[in-house]
Amino acid sequence: MSRRQTCSLLLIAFGLFYLVPLSNHGLWIPDETRYAQISQAMLLGGDWVSPHFLGLRYFEKPVAGYWMIALGQAVFGENLFGVRIASVVATALSVLLAYLLARRLWRDPRTSLACALLYASFGLIAGQSGYANLDPQFTFWVNLSLVALWHALDAGSRRARLLGWTLLGLACGMGFLTKGFLAWLLPVLVALPYMLWQRRWRELLGYGALAVLAALLVCLPWALAVHAREADYWRFFFWHEHIRRFAGEDAQHSRPWWFYLPLLAVACLPWSGLLPSALRQAWHERRQAPVVFLALWLLLPLAFFSLSRGKLPTYIMPCLLPLALLMGHALVQRLRLGNSVALRGNGLLNLGLALLALAALAYLQLRKPVYQEEPFELFLVLLVIGAWAAAGLAQWRYPLRAWAAPLLASWVLIALLPAAMPNHVVQNKTPDLFVAEHLDELTGARHLLSNDLGAASALAWRLRRSDVTLYDTRGELKYGLSYPEHSQRSVPLADIRQWLWRARQDGSIAVLLRINSASDRYQLALLPGDGERYRNGNLVLAILPQVRP
């Protein structure tokens, strides 16, 4: 197949598996609705400096990630595609970086293509590409900073070296504006030991200053602007989002230190069967500069994230590009040698996983059906399992010819699985679809009320309003609600009837509740019985009409 044909086929696959599904399912709570609403508020209100969630100060992240999601909504509309396109673009650019870095390291087109394809089809990378959060963007900036570092170190001229270090600084600056100080730390974790090993520490000190200057030029305008606007921003952001998450006893998402070790194997499905051979080859080539650089990039950030108390699966996404390159390099070496053992093992692993998933689905359907009168969704999930099994079987039977079969498994999974979710999951996790069904009833509401931040942000995004009052909930908006001018934005349970009576004299109220517990049912019971009510799964929408004093 010619290069032009390969590129055309990959572009078609990108459109079919990555772009088309973006509009086929609602926004998942809590992340997608949160980021959609924050960026929409920037777009509508014009405040590009201070992030606000539901109109309240929200200082958990800087602003660049919101800017990119807002840009997507500005260009493509305030819709599902517009909210998610930033993640797809960031992922596509990271795939391109994988290709370019592999080409620079090994100067072999086949290896470059294999590395890019593996990275694009890693389960964690592909799955996050259609999900509106900040991790794909942050991962791209970290990837760009370290690719720029290698280009600077491998440059043949002073001009190219200056360009590489400058690009490194710009990428660190944008990464900082996306997710914070980690964007500076991760490149240092790799650059410092690598350049000490190469005995190039003077170069690190000299050119590193240029990278720091470039990063400051990117960061300082916003950093000073937000400090002038919100004097408490940096205190909260540094201590709450960095120190507390890393070392605090009450850190969010606390996990054991080994949490990421098995997760790393899961993250690179459907290629996990190649991990042992790739790591073994990396060990044999441990004195080669490219392998040392990639190993440091993989292992040191992984060790840092493992030491942190707070852990989420997506935190290790910056570690996956070097892993894809090590695996792609080992894969092509085995293809050239005609060694099919690792490929057969990977195919057998995927086939076994597909059969296990099929058996689990059959068991659940017989004992406690996951899908109830949902033949289309059940068909889609069977199609996903079938594609995974077919890819595994093909790679097991014809490992040297069908080595790329897992691509199909991964891409069918990300394209179809969101649409294959059971109705009870969709109803519970994508409340914006329920809101969209009742826009006519909601449009005239004077007040909005919700007992759940995910549902509240879905309501705000669909209605293009930030003024949702919180019903007996605070969550991650505890800090924003602590400001005196916003204390009325949250109504405790004891005051709800009085608040409803006063608010209804001013106009109608739309109340969106998620009912997941006895306390939620009690919240529902406290609402007046008049007006209209609509229910979908565990979501209840009540339209309470205006009353006269």
From Swiss-Prot:
Q: Which reaction does it catalyse?
A: 4-amino-4-deoxy-alpha-L-arabinopyranosyl di-trans,octa-cis-undecaprenyl phosphate + lipid IVA = lipid IIA + di-trans,octa-cis-undecaprenyl phosphate
Transmembrane segments annotated in the record for this chain: 9-29, 80-100, 112-132, 136-156, 176-196, 204-224, 256-276, 288-308, 312-332, 346-366, 376-396, 402-422
This protein's pathway reads: Lipopolysaccharide metabolism; 4-amino-4-deoxy-beta-L-arabinose-lipid A biosynthesis
Tell me what topology the record assigns in the membrane: Multi-pass membrane protein
Any one of the GO BP annotations: response to iron(III) ion
User: What is the uppermost EC class here?
Assistant: transferase
Main subcellular location of this protein, as a coarse class: membrane
> Which is one Pfam family of this protein?
PMT
KW Cell inner membrane (keyword) present:
yes
Keywords, A to Z?
Answer: Cell inner membrane, Cell membrane, Glycosyltransferase, Lipid A biosynthesis, Lipid biosynthesis, Lipid metabolism, Lipopolysaccharide biosynthesis, Membrane, Transferase, Transmembrane, Transmembrane helix
EC number(s) in its UniProt entry?
A: 2.4.2.43
Q: Where in the cell is it found?
A: Cell inner membrane
One function term, GO molecular function aspect: mannosyltransferase activity
Say which domain of life the source belongs to: Bacteria
How is this protein annotated for GO cellular component? plasma membrane
> What job does the chain carry out?
Catalyzes the transfer of the L-Ara4N moiety of the glycolipid undecaprenyl phosphate-alpha-L-Ara4N to lipid A. The modified arabinose is attached to lipid A and is required for resistance to polymyxin and cationic antimicrobial peptides.
| Similarity remark | Belongs to the glycosyltransferase 83 family.
Enumerate the PANTHER family for this protein: MANNOSYLTRANSFERASE YKCB-RELATED, UNDECAPRENYL PHOSPHATE-ALPHA-4-AMINO-4-DEOXY-L-ARABINOSE ARABINOSYL TRANSFERASE
Q: What is the name listed in the Swiss-Prot or TrEMBL entry for this protein? A: Undecaprenyl phosphate-alpha-4-amino-4-deoxy-L-arabinose arabinosyl transferase
Species of origin: Pseudomonas aeruginosa (strain ATCC 15692 / DSM 22644 / CIP 104116 / JCM 14847 / LMG 12228 / 1C / PRS 101 / PAO1)
Q: Lineage, please?
A: Bacteria, Pseudomonadati, Pseudomonadota, Gammaproteobacteria, Pseudomonadales
